[in-house]
Design a protein with these regions (language model features):
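N-terminal domain-start signal
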Residues: 1-351
């Protein structure tokens, strides 16, 4: 696919943002802070987040406020980048970000329904994105039950996948959160794959297919690893039932062999030795044991420095910016609990 000249601005801006990312030495400084106020002050004065935190008073900011402001800043960066998208590619950028925001909000509501605290939804939902979302946050904030959630989602692509998880057992009314999450994420990737197929071709299509296929395969690797580790008696078929639909079919015989392994470590070694994902080395497969953030870090680093495609650079930036916020949140929480700086550093994913 020929890249429109205006979209070159997306690639240029993303690479500039990536070049200003928080680096290891700055994370080390953050880990030595003692309070949320000190962390906020350092972020405001010494990192690329100066503009995002321009109106923040570090002395009085709470941890939840800081996190919300960082997410708003990330969203504003998305809005700035998508201005340069062409009419043909805008659907991809929108769906990649906003559909995921919608799914995260729905999952948040399901968690609150399960614990009987739905009134807390309105306190934390991202009002800054409300006008861009297709699901009504006002309607969603009034939900008290799963049936009401389904009613609020009537007419969206999320309704039918969630309908199968409606629980009519009054003695045990808990909703299957893991099942809902899998159904919604399958819906997300199915929609995104269709958009990629009709929007891109050539190198852009190939790189996006590669990055998404690798991401899902590694995410499924995490699911298998954790279930093998914490539920060793689960059958391979039961474990596969919790996995996402693959973007690109992996070597199923290898996966089946790994799932029959006796331990989580044997499972991981089988995937490493059998070349579970083409082009991914042993050290990268090891990221399966480290979680989703390590995978996003791996993919961001792997593609950002070599791609010339605006859409791919955009995906890498969204991976990285989310990972950066997660790192900051982890530091704030760890500092609150008085953890040693060296221990905090081990919790972070750093490129």
């Amino acid at each position: 696919m020929r890249t429109d000249f205006s979209e070159n601005a997306i690639s240029a801006k993303v690479h500039a943002l990536y070049g200003r990312r928080i680096v290891r030495s700055q994370y080390e400084e953050l880990c030595r802070k003692h309070t949320t106020s000190e962390i906020a002050a350092y972020l405001k004065e010494r990192t690329h987040l100066t503009e995002v935190l321009n109106t923040v008073q570090p002395a009085t900011v709470r941890s939840d406020q800081l996190e919300s402001i960082l997410h708003k800043g990330r969203y504003n960066k998305y809005l700035d980048l998508v201005k340069y998208a062409t009419p043909k590619t805008r659907e991809f950028y929108r769906s990649y970000v906003l559909n995921l925001v919608e799914i995260q909000l729905i999952l948040q509501m399901i968690r609150l329904i399960n614990i009987g605290r739905t009134s807390e939804f309105i306190v934390s939902y991202p009002a800054f994105a409300e006008s861009d979302l297709r699901i009504g946050l006002g309607k969603l904030s009034k939900v008290k039950t799963y049936d009401e959630l389904l009613e609020a989602l009537e007419g969206t692509e999320y309704h039918d996948p969630l309908l199968r998880y409606r629980n009519t057992d009054k003695k045990n009314p808990v909703i299957n959160y893991a099942g809902c999450e899998m159904a919604l994420m399958n819906c997300y990737y199915e929609n995104l794959k269709a958009i990629v197929s009709r929007t891109f071709s050539g190198e852009t299509r190939r790189e996006i297919d590669d990055i998404m296929a690798t991401k899902i395969a590694l995410e499924n690797g995490i699911i298998g690893y954790r279930l093998k580790k914490y539920y060793p008696d689960m059958t391979p078929e039961d474990i596969k039932g919790y996995m996402l639909d693959f973007w690109r079919e992996p070597p199923m015989k290898l996966l089946d062999t790994a799932l029959r392994a006796k331990t989580a470590e044997d499972y991981l070694n089988t995937l490493k030795n059998g070349r579970y994902i083409a082009g991914i080395g042993d050290g990268e497969i090891q990221s399966i044991g480290l979680g989703s953030q390590a995978i996003r870090s791996l993919l961001s680093q792997r593609y950002m420095r070599r791609t010339q495609q605006p859409a791919v650079a955009f995906v890498c930036y969204m991976f990285h910016s989310e990972m950066e916020i997660d790192n900051i949140v982890r530091i704030v929480e760890a500092v609150r609990y008085g953890m040693d700086p060296s221990e905090i550093m081990q919790l972070l994913v750093i490129i």
